[in-house]
Amino acid sequence: DTRVRDPRLWYAPWLTPGTHASMAGLATSGTLTHWFRDQFARDLPKADAFPTLAAEAAESPKGANGLLLLPYFSGERTPIHDTNAKGAFFGLNLTHTRGDMYRALIEGIAYGTNHVTRTYADLNQPPTRLLAVGGGTKNQLWLQATSDITGIDQIVCEKTVGASYGN
């Protein structure tokens, strides 16, 4: 077993005996976008909410006009494994728009993904590509922010319903 053991990751048996998969994941990516929609976009029909929020976020510059978000709204898994970690908006003021807030949310999740990729790089296993699945694949701004922040190209899987389907 040549597995690299690191407490920031978790491991599981893989497809053939003696192999394993090292795994990582954020606690609240998609859930956080749904929370934001439900709290701050009640004026929008649900079917239009995410495209409208993405369009508003696209009007905000990179860095969301100085607004930052820590995406730990339900604790965090990789790499800090802290169920008590808390999320927060930093730098919020009266000039910020809903678009700034949503862009900060997207960028905060992307920085969380970057934290994961740096964990693998610390272990001399830097990712060379990211596989994108789930609802976020419909948000071009989210995909681009993740690629820009991590410096890693993404592949959007053909079936993007979610990681639980093994895609």
Residue spans of the language-model regions?
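Active-site core segments that coordinate phosphate-bearing ligands/cofactors
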Residues: 1-166
